[in-house]
Amino acid sequence: MDFGQPTDESAEAARKAMARAKEDLQKGLFDVLITGPVKSNPNPPREDRALTMMASDMVRIGLVTTHLPIKEVAQAITVEKIVDKGTIFHTSLRRDFRISSARIAVLALNPQQGTEEEQVIKPAVETLETKGIQAYGPYVADEFFGSGLYYDFDGVLAMYDDQGVVPFKTLAPEYSVKLKAGISAVVVTPDHGPAFDIAGKGEADEQSMRHAIYTAIDMFRHRADYDEPLSNPLPKLYHEKREDGDKARFAIKAKDQFKTPPEK
């Protein structure tokens, strides 16, 4: 293998390295996985239950759909999918980034309000609101980013790749990262390609990789802090008496607990 020359052998080595990393991660041999920049898969999976997220100090953008031709996006967007991705996004903002009251902007699909906005995106936003998620929109993408409205939100949910990637690259051209939300492992990668043209020349800027490492460490610590108080919830201290509808407060299972002690 030569520097800057992708081959079948190098692709196979990358696949084996990733398979071994997943295996060791499942065994608990390490806590977070940071992957180096890789060449895009020419045949990526069309469906991904996880949420692809791009993050920088300025903006965080999640994608409802990925790797789809633009002509297929409208058909792929459903209320259920937006709600699912929006819920994952909200959880990640709270758990991975420790934003206690996350505000999410949902982008429109069309430059003007169309069928998808009225029949799909708006109902999805309303459903997210009923779940206690602060979701707003839909916002027209160019107006949203052009006016700087993204400053008012903790995350932006885009409908497809270019709608999120293009403004993200413009706003955060350096030191940004990409991660998968909605999976148990912490997996982060620098948000740029392998730059084969400068491979082996000692010219690459390591700051993006450094930022990916720091982000992964922060996410791991944030998850531990978020999960710790939820690991041992207090037992329910009352139950509903179905036979008469009365509520017996502080009903404890232990029969002898709270008994009046015998007189001495």
Language-model segments: which ranges?
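Anion-binding alpha/beta catalytic cores of soluble intermediary-metabolism enzymes, centered on
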Residues: 1-264
